A protein has these predicted regions:
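Active-site core of glycosidic bond-cleaving carbohydrate-active enzymes
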Residues: 2-146, 205
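Non-catalytic C-terminal accessory modules of carbohydrate-active enzymes
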Residues: 93-228
Length: 228
């Protein structure tokens, strides 16, 4: 769009090549998440668009110098961009987590914990759309339907399974009904405890709980209701 309408929308038509660009065809079901086209789209977003000159706090030189912390999100209105959804559909855990937290850091108002429209000081404050999409991403982090399967904790950070940490989810809405679960790590004893209250309206074909050890150690055994 930028080459054809460079002055549109306060001179920011360039951002629509990525924020409402071709990647939107993935979560809407037009492009297969694991297709070669989608891999190229995501690579271009990460390597080019997310590191280009953005609004206010994000000049290209700074983005490229600190690509890990300042990458992973678009540079005008990050929650227009659905790259976290694309990562979730591709089951790419670490890219999802990076984009999730980097976007929050770019938009959060630390005084009242609301979300700006355009980064730390610009646009609407306490923005409804940004709040809604933050909740949408958080829900995907904690609960995700995959066909007739229900995944729990599919994209949580492994830091939450360190000593003294844990995850508790209550009354999470899914198309199977509400679900609840709790993950309690016991790193000193080398095990993780999980309690699940499955949905009652319609049972999923499978309930999948993802547990990633903070140090990357493999799982040795599993016991369900006391039975291995």
């Amino acid at each position: 769009l930028a080459e054809f309408f460079p002055g549109q929308d306060a001179g920011r038509s360039w951002c629509y090549d990525v924020e409402i660009g071709a990647h939107q065809l993935v979560p809407t079901g037009v492009l297969a998440p694991r297709g070669r086209e989608v891999e190229r789209i995501v690579d271009h977003m990460e390597d080019v668009q997310f590191l280009a000159d953005g609004w206010f706090d994000y000049p290209a030189a700074a983005n490229r110098a600190d690509w890990y912390n300042l990458g992973g999100f678009s540079k005008v209105q990050p929650y227009y961009t659905r790259n976290c959804e694309v990562y979730a559909l591709r089951d790419e855990v670490k890219p999802f987590i990076r984009s999730y937290f980097n976007s929050i850091a770019a938009l959060i108002n630390p005084e009242v914990l609301t979300l700006w429209e355009h980064f730390h000081h610009s646009g609407a404050w306490d923005k409804t759309h940004e709040t809604g999409y933050f909740l949408h991403q958080t829900r995907t982090m904690l609960v995700q339907e995959r066909g007739e399967d229900l995944w729990l904790a599919p994209f949580i950070t492994s830091k939450w399974l360190e000593d003294g940490q844990g995850v508790t989810v209550r009354k999470a809405p899914t198309r199977f009904g509400t679900v609840a679960y709790e993950i309690i790590p016991h790193p000193q004893a080398n095990y993780v405890e999980a309690r699940i209250e499955p949905p009652a309206r319609r049972l999923p074909k499978q309930i999948v709980l993802r547990l990633r050890h903070p140090e990357g150690k493999p799982m040795r055994s599993v016991a369900v209701n006391g039975k291995k």
